[in-house]
Structure formats: C-alpha cells, structure tokens
C-alpha cells in the first residue's frame, strides 16, 4: 500500500504558491495568465518525472496519465484546477492536484 509523503506534499504546495501575481496578498493565478502557464510548465515537469505521459488538450488542460498493470480493471480518474481566485489560499486547487 502506498502512503502520502507529507514533506513532498508540503514542498509541492509551496512550489506552486510561487506562481503568483499577488505575493504577500494570497495567491492569484488566473487562468491562462503568465503565472498559470508557469505553474502548468512546472507541474508538467513534475508529472513527467513521476513517470506519467503528459499532454495538453484543446482547451489547455494539462492531462497526466499512468497506465495500470491490469487492463481488465476500470480506469481511475481524478481532477482539480490549477487556477485560483484573486487573493486565494495556497491550497485552492493545489491539494486536489497533488493528492490526486
């Protein structure tokens, strides 16, 4: 059974929080902005390093895929968002991505 690595989760939350248009005033990472695209590039690199195949769909969604070992079993899908509201919290969206 796999267990969550708390330190790695915290490091990734902090790394994503750096892609922010409003330092010192919460996290602002609006869709398709410079901050959003930089966070997306960072996340793409992390997913590839974890062994996932990664692609962007026609709407700009980043999709990571890891094949299972038993094709007779149903697929598992998880999702979240990388953008934020203005001056949001650093966990908004990030935790869903990281823990997914």
Tell where the protein language model's regions lie, with residue ranges.
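N-terminal capping segment at the start of a domain
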Residues: 2-33
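Short coil/turn connectors at secondary-structure junctions
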Residues: 50, 71-76
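Predominant activation on well-ordered alpha-helical scaffold segments within soluble catalytic domains
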Residues: 10-14, 44, 97-98
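Short glycine-enriched loops at secondary-structure junctions
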Residues: 9, 68-69, 82
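Alpha-helical metal-binding/catalytic segments enriched in His/Glu/Asp
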Residues: 78, 88-100
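Glycine/charged-rich beta-loop-alpha catalytic/anionic-binding loops adjacent to active sites
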Residues: 74-86
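A generic secondary-structure signal marking the coil-to-beta-strand transition
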Residues: 12, 60, 74-76
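A non-catalytic alpha/beta surface segment that caps or lines the substrate-entry region
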Residues: 21-67
């Amino acid at each position: 059974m796999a267990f969550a690595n708390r330190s790695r989760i915290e490091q990734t939350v902090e790394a994503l929080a750096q892609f922010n248009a409003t330092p010192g005033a919460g996290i602002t990472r609006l869709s398709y902005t410079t901050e959003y695209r930089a966070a997306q590039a960072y996340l793409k690199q992390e997913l590839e390093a974890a062994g996932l195949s990664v692609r962007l769909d026609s709407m700009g969604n980043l999709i990571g895929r890891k094949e299972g070992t038993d094709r007779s079993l149903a697929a598992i899908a998880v999702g979240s968002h990388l953008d934020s509201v203005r001056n949001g919290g650093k966990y908004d969206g990030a935790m869903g991505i990281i823990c997914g």
